Amino acid sequence: MLTALCEDCRSAEAAYDRVDQSLGWLLAGDDQRYPQTPPELFPIAATGADGIHVGYVVHAPELAASDYPVAEFEPMDRDVGACLLGTSTIEAVEVLLSTRLLYDQLPFSHEWWPEVGARLRRLGIEPAPAKAQRHDDLRKPVAPTVPDGWKHMPSSDGVGVLAPATEFHPAPPDPMEERPDVGSVLDAASKHLYDFPATALWLLRECYWRTWTALDNDTFALCDAMVDCYHSLNRPSLAAVVDRRIARL
């Protein structure tokens, strides 16, 4: 994808500018995370406004995949979690370019666009207003492909928990209160940790989403318990993300 956008760029700086001019992305990495960024969202870019960042959502790192959904996360909007841009890199880029075609036309006025557009078409990317992301589409959560025998439980952070169905308690948990009792949630998650770690993780993430701004001992306890859940699910890379979060709090 970057090759199609930047094949004729003569420097890293020129490639960086090309991505910004075409997609409105400032290429970035893990430093874009906020305390409430879902661990499964791995930032690749920022927009330069209000902390908004874009990344790949990796629900289950143990599942081999050649591509992942792309989501946008706006940390200043506490009511909205990660929002789907595209189920793949190609779809996300096509949606972004189509949105710019509909609203501002900016990439298409550059002298490099005809050549870049031709390369993108060879990848199957053909921007069109009908493919644009309109304002009523901005709040789609990131729903993964669910393998046979697996289950996805949506969550308030827009990502949800994906795991083998046997890792969830047979009885779905009650909806989380807006002001949950953190101690009770920690106790419930602890009871599920070894037999039903996916349910435990869902409880902890829902509670954290509602309470993280307190930045108190409960916040750290929720994060520590999430680390245990990710290890129980054999997802050390996601446990490491939460460990880094703890270090930054």
Indicate where each model-derived feature is located.
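Compact, glycine/acidic-enriched structural inserts
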Residues: 63-116
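Hydrophobic, aromatic-enriched interface-forming segments
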Residues: 103-141
